Amino acid sequence: MNNPTVAQYTLARLSQLGIDRIFGVPGDYAFSIDDAAEQVPGLEWVVCANELNAAYAADGYARIRGAAMLTTTYGVGELSAINGVMGSLTHRLPVFHLVGMPSERIQIQNLVTHHNLGDTNFSRFLPIAGAAAGVTAILT
């Protein structure tokens, strides 16, 4: 990959750690992550029926393989996965939860979009989802 995106680089590095599957549900804000997964050699994109199932699948994978990746979309997706993600944290399982967010352009222009509460507080869900994470970071 010449000039990889942040998503491609992140997924490639996690793949180098031996994680060969990423579990999740396609979502419009996560399409860049979903597309990047298709570009990483040896990484299988496992599409799940819903975000909670994806989180539980990642939890099970981490129990067997040592670490896992999960991807969801902003807001409704990340909140739907939270019970599985919190369970992984409780059992000290390294599950990397990658959440696709509205673009910088949308955030800078303060555009009201779907998956929010009718306002432009794009970090509203970070404290909630972040409580289920060992570490959080916003990558652009």
Regions found by a protein language model. Name each.
Residues M1-T140:
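N-terminal alpha/beta PP-like core and its mobile active-site loop of ThDP/TPP-dependent enzymes
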